[in-house]
Structure formats: C-alpha cells, structure tokens
Amino acid sequence: MTTSIIERIDAWAEKTPDFPCYEYAGTRLSYKELKRQSDAFGSFLLNTLNSDKEKPIIVYGHMSPLMLIAFLGTIKSGRAYVPVDVSMPVERIEQIKKAADPALFICTEELPSNLTITGCPVLTQDQLMDALEKHFEEVPDPAECVKNDDNYYIIYTSGSTGNPKGVQISQNNLVSFSNWILQDFSLRQGLRFLNQAPFSFDLSVMDLYPSLLSGGTLVPLDKTITANMKDLYREIPAQNFDVWVSTPSFADLCLLDDNFNQENNPNLTRFLFCGEVLAKKTASELLDRFPDAVIYNTYGPTEATVAVTQVKVTRELIDAYPSLPLGVIKPDMRLHIVDQETGEILPEGEKGEIILIGASVSKGYLNEPEKTDQVFFDYKGYQAYHTGDSGVIKDGYLFFQGRLDFQIKLHGYRIELEDIENNLKKVSYIQNCAIIPKMKDEKVDMLVAQVIPSSHDFEKEYQLSAAIKNELKEFMPAYMIPRKWIYKTEFPLTMNGKIDRKALNSEVNK
C-alpha cells in the first residue's frame, strides 16, 4: 500500500534505475533520471520561491517527459501543480492563470506568440533546462514535500459562467485512488501504459500515476499522432501496449481499423475506460477482437479523483442489462442515490442524484468558496459531493441515468452546455443560441448549435457557420465547438418564458 506518492516513485530509481518510466518517439527517460532531475527541479524551486506554498505552480506543455519532471519537482518543493496543455486557446489559459494565481508559470514548451503571462514569474524552457543543470545532484529535504491533505494537483474543468473551476486533489485523495487502481485492477510491475489524454484532463491520472507507482512505462500518443488516422493505426501496434487507458470514443476510433486486434497487439490484456459512457457495442467488439483482454468500465467526476466505481465487463454482463453498469464503489467510499428535492436516500431501484462520500472526494474548488459550498458538504464527518449525475442501483451495480443539469461528457471531456452558450453569445453573428447534445449508442455523439443569428451579409448558411467558428476558435477549445449548426428566427418557449429545450432536443434526437 502506498502512503507517499513520491517515495514510492523514487523507490524505483533504486530497484530498477535504468528501466524507462517514459518512452516515445526515440525519447526515453529512466527512473534514475526522473528522480535525479525532479530532485534538481525541486531544489531549484525551494531555493527560488518564497516559503508561501499555498499558491500552486502552472506547468504548460504537451505530454512530454519534461512535464513529468516538472510535476514531481513541484511536489517535492511542497506545492501543487496545475497542468495546462498546449491545445488550450489563449483566452482559456489566461482564465486559468487568473483563477489559479500561481507562484510560477513553467513552460516546458514555447508559449504562443499572442500569449503574454503577467502577474507572476515565468520560467522558460531554456531557464528550466538551466535550472536542472545548475542543481544537478541536489536533493530537496523530504520534509518539504507535499503530504497528507496538501494539494497535489489542481485540474481546471468547464464552469457554467464560462470561467473554468480548479478542482483541488490532495495527496490523500491521490493515494486512495492509486492504491485502489493498483490492487483492484491487478497492475503488476513493468507494464507499458497508453497515455491518450493530455495531462490537463484528469483521465491522464489513470495512466500516469498507476504507471509510475508500479514501475511501468508511460507511452503517450500525442496530438501529432492522434490527429492522423494512418499514423495512429501504424503507431498503436508498434508501441506494444500492455494497459489501455482511454475514453470509449478513442477506442471506437481505433476499432475502425480492422488490424486493431489481439494478433497485432499480443500484450494488450487490460482496457480501462473512463470519462464517458461505455456503449455495449464498443465493449462487445473489443471482447471479440481481444479474447485475452480484461475490460473495466469505471465512473467518477474530477471532483472525486478520476474514478470511484469499477466493473469487469463480460459477455454475461453485456447480455444481462440494457446498458452497461458503472460498477461498484471502491472500498473507502460510500455512494447514495438521493431525491434531488428532499435529499432523502432512495432505495435500490429508484432513480435520483448520485452522492459520493469519502476518501476520494476533493476539498473543493481553488479560490472559489461559494462554488465549493454549492456542491461539497460534510456527511457524518466525511467529505461529500453532489455529482449532478442521475443514477440508479440495480443488483448492487450503479447505472448512469444522465445529467441532472446541462453538463455532458463528449469524447471524455466534461462540458457544461451553459459554458458553450455563454461563449457563443460573445460571437458578433449570434443573437441567441441553445446547445443540444445529439445522442447515439447511449452517449453524446456531437453538439448541435441552434442559433438565432444577428443580421449579416452572408448568402449561404455554411458561410455564416464558418465565420462563427472562426471567431470561436480564438477563445474556446476545439472539442467544445459544435459540429452541426441549425439557424432559426425564433425559439419555442415554455409556459414560464424559457427556451423549450425539450422541444429542441426532440428535434435534434428524432
């Protein structure tokens, strides 16, 4: 059982010093080098920054070994890190920087030319490399390291106001998650883990820390590979994965290739899914193609440290239910289904809100006490969280029944529809709008924008759509931009004068 994340990772530098903790495209980082360089960086931070450890450190980059070094070095200096991926639009990065109020902004890659960081020190990639060289062989005092209920990382998720919220995950939260994953999923030493998700997305925690804690190798498929289907299909068998961690949507993409099977990936014997609904069709096809593999379906919000339920998906399970269960709760957590209005705990078989209680639950949102109090609460001495997810328990399994609000999962990203709508309303060509998720195979397939446009000079609707998307990409991530656009002169309204979203939903999901 792990009690200190850093101690256990550093121990591999003694046990298997030359074994790669990271390997991709000719770049290889050993456990010995990971310890040595993260020690150097932790020493640099302790020598450079003041003693106030409440402020986190932003680490900007994309799935590189330098990010791992920066993460662990930051932890060794006693501070939490905030991962920010290069794919984020400039405006989003500025929002996160403002909300996090960091002690330092670290660049493991060059910043976009139109982004200027003000209000905190910036460490460029060259300065980072100089710091690693200057403090080489220095070892930070272990007493300075993040411990217990100290924040370990802070991941920013979509917020209903259009501003992201920083979810604080402590060392205790991460220890609880990691011990559960390593034990319940039988992850032995030295396995090769797929890293599909950028580090700014909490699904990445499901491969990053189980890999490092078990003496495994993290093997990323970065955006240059995943953006090109031919490259992706060529790269997967070449990387010789043992453990597959991804969203179901990414697996669906890979299943389009007939060569994605056990014969071409003989070591691939574990699939771990999180981030969105796993459709029966996807699970069934994976069982057909990978007869030696075990498939796990998991569930959990960012606010409860990645995942808190799991179930092994078998043929019998697929045949037994209309949709796949999310599984059973991890041992140090409790789960209740409650009536949304009264808060009363509901019996098995009745649908209500999923409430999570226990060791995995975050302390709340960074610098956002009001938003924290809205969804986090104390339950008999334990931290608890209102997920906003609707669920039901049948035969001891949790089943997902959709969102209680306008929050959805698309390709593993958690998105608040209000966030998109608020951003769309900034566009000069839009007077009013509503975002409707288009469903397919029990999950969100794409986002449809229903728009009342402002006056414009475009002759064709596709020209208007192109102009809107061109404005949107300046301040909204690509995964949040709707794929389909429907233009209207007015919206249907409910009795109380609100947009009739049920009517719009019926139109989109006929």
From Swiss-Prot:
Keywords for this protein: ATP-binding, Cytoplasm, Ligase, Nucleotide-binding
Covalent S-S links between cysteines: none
The protein's name: D-alanine--D-alanyl carrier protein ligase
Record: residues binding D-alanine: D202, V306, K498
GO BP annotations, alphabetical order: lipoteichoic acid biosynthetic process
The organism of origin for this protein: Listeria innocua serovar 6a (strain ATCC BAA-680 / CLIP 11262)
Domain of life of the source: Bacteria
Name of the gene: dltA
GO molecular function annotation: ATP binding; D-alanine [D-alanyl carrier protein] ligase activity
